[in-house]
Amino acid sequence: MIPVQNIYYMLSYAFQALQAQNYKDLATEKFHNTAELCAAILDKGISVQLKRGLGRDYLSKSESLSTLQGRLNISESIKTQTLLKKQMICIYDEFSTNTQFNQIIKSTMLMLLKANITNTRKKSLRNLLLFFSDVNEIDLRFVNWNQHYNRSNQSYQMLIGICYLIYNGLLQTQSDGATKIMD
């Protein structure tokens, strides 16, 4: 039996991003594999992040519009001849939840749904995926796991670390090693 409460407390203290008093309702559970344990930790962490709100950022978009929005890209409008259709190519910033951190979390949840975890955990992850409907899926092989965190996204540090462990099929041990999930 692995006490998930103790592991979650350890992670919350290690990352100093979570307040431990929010997790007093946890108990011990039986986990038959590490994927189940990581899925439980990720499930609880994502639920807390959803209460805070998903991280958002400004993403640059370029598309053909009939009304001016943002900056006008005249050279691209001439090349694609959108002016003949009474449209123009505009470049503008959109405040979106489709950030790299959210993409990593969504892709990891989708990967966990294919893993050998219980049906109740899969159902819980599917319910959480509903909040990530506007977020694109990415290939985790090409993710730069050495992200820099600031005050606005430091709450993602533990979640991304858990996603890294899930992707690589690792669990952190107390012995010295080369893998870091926290700077």
Regions found by a protein language model. Give the residues of each.
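Catalytic core segments in nucleotide and nucleic-acid processing enzymes
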Residues: 183
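Terminal, charged accessory segments of proteins
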Residues: 1-177
